[in-house]
Amino acid sequence: GLIDSVYEKKKVEKKDLKSIVDQVKNGKIEGVNITVPFKKEIIDLLDHVHGDALLTQSVNTLCRRSNKVYGYNTDTEGFKESLRDGHIEYRNKNILILGAGGVTSSILEAFINNAKKIYITNRTKKKAEELKKLGDTSIATLQRKKETIEIIDWGKKPKICDIVINTTSVGLIKDENLDLDFKDYKNNKNVLFYDLIYNPKETNFLKDAKLRGNKTMNGKMMFLWQAQIAFKIWTNISPTIDDEVIRLLDWWLKLEF
């Protein structure tokens, strides 16, 4: 059946966050998705922060439970589902994460339980260190080695990794480049280069990887899977992700951008 509801996009400022949380609490709004830059700022306004959202300090979904406002993170599971969807094995692999912004903690959390080694590199090293500290908390809980996460200077690269992920916004604007050298990955068809950006659907980061002969994936399926999880939180209904849904998203992206 149909659900009698409307999903709207609103541009807000930090001062608007409390009002939005209050509207969820009093039933004027049933559910909310939060995007960068407010995924962390919203936490202090909530009654309860759930699981991954607490570990990552990143909330992207709000809902009401017994007149209390709950915060969830669907990015981590959405990202993992996108890898499963693409038949990408990520357990016991070496991972290189580029960036340390709003969504990066969710990507880090996805790998913490299973990766052999996780390297983080960011232009601002302090941000990478804060991210590592957050990750180390999860590692301690899982009783894994503290050396699982390592920070490397921007521009330097560790040994060949199995998955390289761009979590920065570089690539949103046409012809933007990360200015990182990956020529030693040439003809390595087992390495996955993953860009969280899904519009444009192929950034220069992915184009270059394809030219080198690497596997590539953009963030479109992560976007869909995290949305499915959020929808279930709100409605207890888990929509099917099929070719028609993907086609509708492609159509919407052309209109929106």
Q: What would you call each of these model-derived segments?
A:
Residues 34-41, 102-103, 169-172, 199:
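Short glycine-rich anion-binding loops that position phosphate/pyrophosphate groups of nucleotides
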Residues 1-86:
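Phosphate/diphosphate ligand-binding glycine-rich loop within oxidoreductases
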Residues 71-73, 83, 88-112, 122-123:
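Glycine-rich adenosine-cofactor-binding loop
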Residues 65, 88-94, 187-189:
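Short helix-loop-beta connector
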Residues 143-216:
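Rossmann-like adenosine-cofactor binding region
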Residues 191-248:
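Rossmann-fold NAD(P)-binding glycine/threonine-rich loop
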Residues 115-138:
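NAD(P)-binding Rossmann-fold cofactor-contacting core
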Residues 112-117, 211-215:
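Conserved S-adenosyl-L-methionine
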